[in-house]
Amino acid sequence: MEKIGNDYHIPVLYYETLDNLVINPDGTYIDCTLGGGSHSEGILERLSDKGLLISIDQDTNAIEYSKKRLEKFGSKWKVFKGNFENIDTIAYMAGVDKVDGILMDIGVSSKQLDDPDRGFSYRYDVKLDMRMNTDQKISAYDVVNTYSEEQLSKIIFEYGEERHARKIAKLIVEERKSSPIEKTSDLITLIKRAYPERASKHPAKKTFQAIRIEVNRELEVLENAMSKAVELLKVGGRLAIITFHSLEDRIVKNKFKDLATACKCPKDIPICVCGGVKKFEIITKKPIIPIDDELKNNNRAHSSKLRILERIFD
């Protein structure tokens, strides 16, 4: 399999995404999650000189890295620093009213995970951080050291799907009474105390995921961004979303199902009285998942799923 990507990030479902998204070479597209620029570069390579790609990222490092890579495409590429939750505002700033396609590659990038200074990974002993946007104030340190036991238990259980959530939250609150929990190693030590001696996966994986999601408001951002994104689509325009865990995928699946349903009447009404018109079609009846070759070459592709929605009526 041909290697796609770079030392910043290896994109998942690369060809599957581009083949299903870029169907008008003269069109206008938005890449909501620029990262290392691999998907953006792939889109740009498929666009004619009449086409336009708008890329968005809240990570300054990602933008600076990708600028060097993509500036060769000239005026058919525009980049904006910001959260894709504000996709409508960014499209307006770019002078765009409607688009032919939008890509959202959800979650943390390989570069962010592998950068010890960012505090995303339990593999490095560093200060708790986990901010995708380093300009924002709240970090993992703040969540761990200021949230109540009830709040911690809730996010660890809901966002990490961690069955030991209550015990972990209790241990965190007890520990910070004597001194702040500052580093990843401090948090990992507490989490391990809540686990049985033999665990098949790293005990901290789910809790770190939960805290990262909370710090960056990932699920809230996804829901808000989807609602705004579909309003930007032309008839025939597509929204492609790549997810990496069940929480994200469930949100996308349910949102697509709701959008592709014509009738919006309450379920207890036996017949449709709203006169709703079907405006969207789900292109992927089942999510597209990586082929074996990709799984062999990119371990982080294992949980990825691609879902695609198309506007069929304005």
UniProtKB/Swiss-Prot annotation:
* Record EC number: 2.1.1.199
The residues that hold S-adenosyl-L-methionine are G37, S38, H39, D57, F84, D105, Q112
Tell me where it resides. Cytoplasm
Main location per UniProt?
Answer: cytoplasm
Span of the secretion signal?
Answer: none
Reactions mediated catalytically: cytidine(1402) in 16S rRNA + S-adenosyl-L-methionine = N(4)-methylcytidine(1402) in 16S rRNA + S-adenosyl-L-homocysteine + H(+)
- Which InterPro entries would you find in this protein's record? RsmH, SAM-dep_MeTrfase_MraW_recog, SAM-dependent_MTases_sf
For the biological process aspect of GO, one term held by this record is: rRNA base methylation
The reply to whether 4Fe-4S figures as a keyword in the UniProt entry is no
A GO CC term? Answer: cytoplasm
A GO molecular function term, named singly, is:
rRNA (cytosine-N4-)-methyltransferase activity
List the keywords (alphabetical): Cytoplasm, Methyltransferase, rRNA processing, S-adenosyl-L-methionine, Transferase
Its family? Belongs to the methyltransferase superfamily. RsmH family.
What this protein is reported to do is described as: Specifically methylates the N4 position of cytidine in position 1402 (C1402) of 16S rRNA.
Report what the protein is called. Ribosomal RNA small subunit methyltransferase H
